[in-house]
């Protein structure tokens, strides 16, 4: 039976192996490493798996890992999703819909259900400012929202989106580190600074979520 402590360790192992691409490449060798740890360790399964992580796999999540160009549903977004589900985070515009329930919506052909990745700085905003479109695709610029909310925001600038939110909606957005605390970093000319600012806060929150000192 998995207790709370072991569940925390398993969560850490799953998220860190995803973030670090542990199972890319020589998969059989990697699987054998963890199987051996489970067989030989006298500790509970979760702790045994975490102990078997290499030093670079087990380290804290760094802000720079959230600044690299990433697929919309890549490993970093999967970890962000797990964190938001644990926080019982909600859609910014619809308080009745949690991030978890959006992903579980039936009858929608997309892998994420009614949940989608929202670019805080829209791609059009950045390309209009002379940046390459790839610059938008980094986890530090991603938020998870409903498809309808994402469509509502469209290609509006983030400071315009923030102005349109009610106080309660701003609270829900604040869970994902979007809000007044960003100050004038929400202007397109400070995009890099915004991403660095938000990446630092996301990394801190994810490390706390995973129980990493």
Task: Name these PLM-found stretches.
Residues 18-118, 125:
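Intrinsically disordered, low-complexity N-proximal targeting/linker segments that flank membranes
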Residues 8-24, 38-39, 115, 119, ...:
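Short, mixed-charge aromatic SLiMs
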Residues 1-2:
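Polyanionic (Asp/Glu-rich) segments that form extended negatively charged tracts
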Residues 131-135, 153-179:
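Polybasic, low-complexity binding patches
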Residues 6, 170-213:
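C-terminal, well-folded lobe of enzymatic/effector domains
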Residues 12, 16-20, 40, 123-127, ...:
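Short, well-ordered loop/turn and helix-capping segments at boundaries between secondary-structure elements
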Residues 115, 127-153:
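Short beta-strand-alpha-helix junction that forms the catalytic/metal-binding core
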């Amino acid at each position: 039976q998995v207790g709370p402590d072991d569940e925390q360790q398993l969560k850490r192992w799953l998220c860190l192996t995803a973030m670090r691409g542990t199972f890319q490449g020589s998969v059989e060798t990697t699987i054998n490493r963890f199987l051996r740890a489970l067989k030989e360790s006298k500790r509970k399964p979760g702790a045994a798996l975490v102990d078997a992580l290499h030093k670079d796999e087990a380290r804290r999540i760094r802000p720079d890992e959230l600044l690299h160009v990433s697929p919309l549903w890549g490993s970093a977004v999967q970890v962000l999703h797990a964190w938001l589900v644990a926080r019982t985070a909600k859609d910014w515009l619809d308080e009745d819909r949690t991030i978890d329930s959006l992903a579980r919506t039936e009858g929608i052909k997309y892998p994420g259900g009614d949940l989608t990745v929202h670019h805080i700085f829209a791609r059009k905003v950045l390309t209009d400012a002379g940046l390459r479109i790839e610059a938008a695709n980094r986890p530090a610029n991603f938020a998870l929202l409903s498809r309808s909310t994402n469509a509502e925001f469209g290609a509006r600038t983030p400071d315009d989106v923030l102005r349109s939110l009610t106080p309660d909606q701003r609270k829900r957005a604040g869970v994902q580190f979007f809000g007044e605390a960003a100050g004038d970093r929400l202007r397109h000319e400070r995009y890099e600074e915004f991403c660095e600012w938000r990446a630092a806060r996301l990394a801190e929150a994810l490390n706390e979520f995973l129980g990493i000192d």
